[in-house]
Amino acid sequence: MHDLRAIRDNPEAFDTGLARRGLPPASAAILDLDQRRRAAQTSFQECQARRNEASRLIGAYKKDGKDAQPLLDEVAALKERIPALEEEDRRLGAELDALLAALPNLPAADVPEGKDEHDNVEIRRVGTPRDIPGAKQHFELGEALGLMDFEGAARMSGARFTVLKGQLARLERALGDFMLDLHTREFGYTEVSPPLLVRDEAVFGTGQLPKFADDLFRTTTGHWLIPTAEVTLTNLANDSIIDAEALPWRLTARTPCFRSEAGSAGKDTRGMIRQHQFMKVELVSITLPEQSEAEHERMTKAAETVLERLGLPFRTVVLCTGDMGFSARKTYDIEVWLPGQGAYREISSCSNCGDFQARRMKARSRPKGEKGTQVVHTLNGSGVAVGRALIAVMENYQQPDGSILVPEALRPYMGGQERITAHG
């Protein structure tokens, strides 16, 4: 959500930010609604105040033997008028909130201009892709090993689901355990086991609602399956005032994530790249405003460290204005090398959302001994997507005989196992 005061103070800057997102100006419509809403609010409050004052005077008039009938008539008229004024105030407030809620976050000043992913800017590349003649894709390797079952998953769940078996299932578990240990022990994150079902308010707070409802799964009870643990971890600050001295919060969780993949027809239809259900380790930070830029770099380093320890080549790019997510003001994508595809593919996205989500959630902080509060900043990142890490390990560590070497960093989590073989 945007800061209405900032829009009032500098509407031109707000429209410039929207233009960088490829959107038309909106400040005029916002300020018109804001003015009408404030006028309606003033009328409503003035009528309430006059009704209360007139009601007080009625008692005094009667006590003094004065004619109170004009005041009685006035109070009756005000009582009839007030509900309409209250409804007008509510309606205009709802319209203003809806308009603000539909607009994305404004990009940070140092975000590169661009229309789409082709305009993203690479900032570093780590590791050299291995030369693997005839490299196979993960689904070819997994099916040949007898440890990846797409047909069985399709029979019970439909497209974009996978069954992992045996040592591939163990490898998935090992990857998640390794990531959680790294983030909690070396980067100071607190592990959380959050709900997978949330209410409307939670997905509104992080920005998935109202615009992206079609990307989510909703239950018959009205709950939403989380598309990412960003939703639950960030909402731990929902409607809260946090001691400023306790910040930053650093939280991590490994959860299943659920996405409808609306609009992805024909994309990555084979394998595990794009699934309706997948495992991910999420990183979330809640910070003071002055901490968030440094925290963004720190979070991105934590995600990169996962790939460095696994010996996986990757590159990090900063997303351009046309490719950023709805709630982000700046985003780094980390893309891992997949030999089977001969391409770098996203495995982590680390975003600084500034105060955008916090305003939607009413998440604030207060320094010790002070009365005033300030809106916090929120950040989130994949630390990393477990399924895509599994894919990357399979493709980068594949052997000519179809087996897969286990990266050294994972062997303690695999009981010392060094290689995954057929039906292992």
UniProtKB/Swiss-Prot annotation:
Task: Name its species.
Answer: Rhodospirillum centenum (strain ATCC 51521 / SW)
Reactions catalysed, semicolon-separated, are: tRNA(Ser) + L-serine + ATP = L-seryl-tRNA(Ser) + AMP + diphosphate + H(+); tRNA(Sec) + L-serine + ATP = L-seryl-tRNA(Sec) + AMP + diphosphate + H(+)
Q: What Enzyme Commission number(s) does the record list for this chain?
A: 6.1.1.11
Q: Name one GO molecular function term.
A: ATP binding
Q: Per the UniProt entry, what are the Gene Ontology biological process annotations, in alphabetical order?
A: selenocysteine biosynthetic process; seryl-tRNA aminoacylation
Q: Which family does it belong to?
A: Belongs to the class-II aminoacyl-tRNA synthetase family. Type-1 seryl-tRNA synthetase subfamily.
Q: What does the record give as the function of this protein? A: Catalyzes the attachment of serine to tRNA(Ser). Is also able to aminoacylate tRNA(Sec) with serine, to form the misacylated tRNA L-seryl-tRNA(Sec), which will be further converted into selenocysteinyl-tRNA(Sec).
* CDD domains in UniProt: SerRS_core (cd00770)
Per UniProt, the enzyme's principal EC class comes to ligase
Q: Does the keyword Zinc apply?
A: no
Give me the Gene Ontology terms describing cellular component. cytoplasm
The subcellular localization recorded is: Cytoplasm
Q: Which domain of life is it from?
A: Bacteria
Protein name from the UniProt record: Serine--tRNA ligase
Pathway the protein acts in:
Aminoacyl-tRNA biosynthesis; selenocysteinyl-tRNA(Sec) biosynthesis; L-seryl-tRNA(Sec) from L-serine and tRNA(Sec): step 1/1
Domain remarks: Consists of two distinct domains, a catalytic core and a N-terminal extension that is involved in tRNA binding.
Sites binding L-serine sit at: 228-230, 282, 382
The organism's taxonomy opens as: Bacteria, Pseudomonadati, Pseudomonadota, Alphaproteobacteria, Rhodospirillales
The subunit field of the Swiss-Prot or TrEMBL record says: Homodimer. The tRNA molecule binds across the dimer.
Q: Where is the signal peptide?
A: none
The UniProt keyword set, sorted, is: Aminoacyl-tRNA synthetase, ATP-binding, Cytoplasm, Ligase, Nucleotide-binding, Protein biosynthesis
Name the residues that bind ATP: 259-261, 346-349
